[in-house]
Amino acid sequence: MLSFYKKITAAVVAVMMLFVPWASPSANAEETTADLIIYQNIPEVDVKISGNQLSLRALHVHQEGYFTEATEGIRWKSSNKTVAAVDDHGVVTFFGKNGRTFITVTDGKRKDRIAFKVKTAPASHKNSKQNMKVTVVKEKGSRYNIIQKAIDGLTLEEKIGQMLMPDFRNFNGKPVTDMLPEIKELIQKYHLGGVILFRENVVTTEQTAKLVADYQQAAEKFGLLISIDQEGGIVTRLQSGTNMPGNMALGATRSKELAWKVGYAIGEELHALGINMNLAPVLDVNNNPDNPVIGVRSFGENPELVAELGVSYIKGLQDSGVAATAKHFPGHGDTAVDSHLGLPEVPHDRDRLQKVELYPFQKAMEAGIDAVMTAHVTFPKVDDTKVISQKDGTAISLPATLSYKVLTELMREEMGFDGVIITDAMNMKAISDHFGPVDAAVRAVQAGADIVLMPVGLEEVANGLKKAVQNGGISQERINASVKRILTLKVKRGIFKQETPPDMQQIINQALRVVGSQEHKQIEAEAAAKSITLVKNDHVLPLQTSKVNNLVVVGNTMVASLEKAVRTYVPNAAVIQAAAPLNEAQLQKVKEADAVIVGTYTLNVSGRLPSSPQMKMVQQIFANTDAPVIAIGIRNPYDVMAYPHVAAYLAQYGFQQASFQAAVDTIFGVNTPTGKLPVTIPSYDGGVLYEYGHGLTY
């Protein structure tokens, strides 16, 4: 069973401790140690005890203020072994006996303790287990205020480094799949607090686990935030991971349980690799069918649905031990411009924003989201500040990423968010076209951002931020506030340098067991099956294989995935790869068919116009056969706008193999469709083709 409450076992927790970096032994390491504390005594740490085990961790706090995880040369002891025992690794086992015990740790010179009270109630049923409640009694005192002590001991350069998260996607023109000496030097020179990984960097499970461990080994005083965009659906980075259906597919299921399971499974895979921060989920409300960048990355057009499923996904992700990031605040759903390519605008007033765009983010904040990513989008009704673009000297509105009114006044003060604010990538044209690299970074920090993601020119930006502090453009208090939030997140998620290196082979073995596991594949298949939405069916589905003697499958380059699924039912199906009107030979196959399955794939508005080559092909097929034509909207459910007269239409919301298989299983009646449209499908005459919530079944 995929259950968080059954995952708190000694084996899993022991492996979890392996995913953080280690400090190289040094002759004066002992001399710098000022204290030894139990991690769970730190006020910012939420201790969850489920089942009968808990893994305690010990930290050495150094005279300079930074802290490292103590893993060797320490001894654990329980004062009452009838109540609980503790092993050499700090794993506490509770025996279901009423009473109290102190768990003590010592390194021979320093020690700390934490108390547990156990109260057991009789089983409610004859064959059920007794109910055990464990209460944690933390030690208190200034010794546990390690975050502020750490900040006090950092230089300005070190503080700024914590606020930078560059990518090392490529180096000297080649994808970075192994740690390079030059990258290690940059991490240490600029005291980096984190990095972001891309698909080029995470090729295999073994390679990824080793690269992440090497990144962490290169870190200085604190562990790195290792982030990635593993949303599921069309935005996935892990090449060896489970490609979960995306948010709109989950929106079609209407299932909070599935959203949690998908979030948890994604988190398990990331955690197994040592990746501790996921830049997901997307909480944008996709109420604009012309949106070229969000689309199926959103749970749908209804803010309550987005909030409900988004919070479930967040809880699953964070229950796995991985930090979640809601994006793109205050909302990128109602735009028709891709901020990677231009500067979009959301023109709505505060009342509308409060009810729609901001609603899912507010619910995520109330649920304890770790971080929020900003949008490179202008909101003139929130901030009407004009700045001069470096691109052409014209006046433009200030993007949310650089807006004090959006990040501080709205997000911090009005909505009450005190977690980490991270910018979207600063190399996107919505920012880089209009602002210089240093100007953009300084404006983002002044606005309230804690982490500058993918700064353009690491050295230039690091030095520029330092100068801005020195000349009074950014206050020391502003920097300290960001560093406090970043270190709080790291402490909360248990991201520390370890004093001794873990067993790399053990990390790899665990990652191989988790990443792409059969358990996760089953969740992927379940989510895909429940997402398939039968939008139209003129009494042609389900198809019966006994009556389909000549099936033709048509589609673009993704037709191979569709073909693979179809051949599980009709091994001799004819396949045509095309995304434009067919030639005579291809048309002849269509004319001879007794059924045609067409997969259409569109990225944007132009792709689904009836005049586009792909849609002309679909119309051509209609004109050349009397056989039923079944269409699948592979990505966007809006494709049917271009061919409303099709006999049957299914929406699958993504191009994962599991989604193709689920769609084909539905066509042949093996999967009963239960998906409901998470968006409204308009018609080209200004009306509505299919309402939000529409969905047929058998």
Language model region names:
Residues 202-219, 223, 254-272, 484:
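Active-site-adjacent structural elements in enzyme catalytic domains
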Residues 161-168, 193-197, 224-230, 277-281, ...:
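Hydrophobic faces of well-ordered beta-strands that scaffold small-molecule active sites
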Residues 182-198, 265, 269-277:
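Catalytic domains of carbohydrate-active enzymes, especially glycoside hydrolases
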Residues 169-172, 227-236, 276-286, 326-332, ...:
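Short glycine-enriched loops at secondary-structure junctions
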Residues 26-125:
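Extracytoplasmic soluble-region selector
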Residues 89, 119-188, 434-698:
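Preference for extracellular/luminal or secreted protein segments
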